[in-house]
């Protein structure tokens, strides 16, 4: 093809060639501007294309991509209706149709350790992020509550009881690790582990009185705050004639027996639960208590002795003020005691003097006073509902580990539906940003946090909004769960604060994303010692490292965020390409595929698309099906185009050299004429076959200049052209324009200074006063990663 030289743009041969290409571009535009062939068909008529069923895929891999693109514009794919269609495309299934999970009765609950980071990290790693994390807060606008019995999803109908049993073990393991609160009553929960400083003011402090009973003191007060009566104590150490029916009356207010009954039936038999009543009596209730019997007996005691109980409540004198103790013990003792009319102590085994309840029937064992190690009782600044907001089920830990279970928490009510929340955004690097921030030629080490989300503590009032259950007990997340959209944002703040301090303290290039840390340094031996120091530094602050996923020593090739990264290039693993080619080969021409399945397919294509010679416009037909929620049918040429994309695999350079070439070609258009001007003084004016919108005429001239001259950059006075967002154009033209203009830079020049503005108006070009600017938005890179 002739290239323009000095004063050569007016040559007749070049003009004839340019006019020929211009007519081809105009025909491509005009064939689709009148009627868009990709509009959804509301019925599956005979016009639906279904040739070549069973035809093997033999694409001509030697053919240029431009030829394959043009063939796809002739043999179009089709959009169908909303009737049921195929949900499987190779190994891909619909996005909302999960692969059937198989229940494993031998599932093991993974080892979960107490992840309590030291609040000294606020001083060691100064950052404004900590005010959002110590503690984190979660305030949904509205909440839908579900019954406790619906806590475990019926994911495995044939193994309901076994599924609930393993979920119960899993939740108990989380509770033992200090990740969950366990509900005792409407105003009282218990947890294990070291309390945070914001929890200390809500801790229930129990003191031993001389007669052996325990009193529950909240912030130094022993009054009944519900009735707002004068400070009266129900328990007197020298009162030997206390009526045993007072147990039933106390249960009317804040009875641990009633809370046990409300938590569901007894499916698991475990250790006796110790709970503190505000009146000073502590009743041990076994978890296998019968809920109906317990509730009925408490009701009977309340009805029979309500008047006598109230009068005795008002006549009691306070025993004196207990001073607020600052030393909180690490264990809570709860004695199971009662008073008979004769003054004898009644144990849970003696059922003659206590009201008939679940505690008197099923608590024959473990009725002696017990000590709960490292346990705390907390009366939060909120009520603890006996309902749940999320549901649970178990799956395999991953495809390689099917012996251990993974707990899936469904808090989707906070991300969709009437309770949907708008969670804050956070910086997430795309591929272009990652290419620009990664250092070249440095050894790298990858660190991975263990139980990353469980490092993030929640405000107790926020925890009450994140309630789950195994069908028997109600638990609340004390640490951030994985099923809430706020958790990734909190984790981003957490790791960013740590990464900034690591980079400053150890003088190493550090990049963090979610629970991954990437460390780079020119000296491999120095980087190895730094990585050990970083691990020690984090572990001293109570932050746990997953050494199974951590790079043991500096390496040159590393897998990070799904990319294979070496010293100079980024690429996609070959196994991923093979899987994608296999899926494309299994596409049946003319078969209807459900839009959810297409959505899954497009997600995989989008990930690999930057590593091909294609562009996003090539996927527009599938996006149209997803947007309209209709079925999709592949044509033979379109399937060949997708396969061709996976054949031209390329690798991307890390830290690509940014060049700003000087513009030598300018274009301009009017509704009737278009002009191309070269810096050497040559120019050409071409007439359009018909009048169209001005932005289409401008784009036609820019595409023509790219075909005929092949410059490194082009000047244009159309912002529509310079932004390269052509999704509003017909698919044929948009795909070709994107393909032509992606490799080159487009500069915006005001019409007043556009050198091609003169030739389009039959005036000479003027390159003397040239003012231009690129309109591409600068990629945002955090300040700490700039200049490294």
UniProtKB/Swiss-Prot annotation:
Site positions per UniProt: Priming of reverse-transcription by covalently linking the first nucleotide of the (-)DNA: 96
Known regulation of activity: Activated by host HSP70 and HSP40 in vitro to be able to bind the epsilon loop of the pgRNA. Because deletion of the RNase H region renders the protein partly chaperone-independent, the chaperones may be needed indirectly to relieve occlusion of the RNA-binding site by this domain.
GO molecular function, one term: metal ion binding
Domain Reverse transcriptase: 376-565
Annotated region (Disordered), positions in chain: 36-56, 220-242, 288-380
Ranges where the record places region Terminal protein domain (TP): 1-200
Start and end residues of each stretch annotated as Polymerase/reverse transcriptase domain (RT): 366-655
Binding locations of Mg(2+): 448, 515-516
Enzyme Commission designation: 2.7.7.7, 2.7.7.49, 3.1.26.4
Enzymatic reactions: DNA(n) + a 2'-deoxyribonucleoside 5'-triphosphate = DNA(n+1) + diphosphate; Endonucleolytic cleavage to 5'-phosphomonoester
Region (Spacer): 201-365
Function: Multifunctional enzyme that converts the viral RNA genome into dsDNA in viral cytoplasmic capsids. This enzyme displays a DNA polymerase activity that can copy either DNA or RNA templates, and a ribonuclease H (RNase H) activity that cleaves the RNA strand of RNA-DNA heteroduplexes in a partially processive 3'- to 5'-endonucleasic mode. Neo-synthesized pregenomic RNA (pgRNA) are encapsidated together with the P protein, and reverse-transcribed inside the nucleocapsid.
Record protein name field: Protein P
Source species: Duck hepatitis B virus (isolate white Shanghai duck S31) (DHBV)
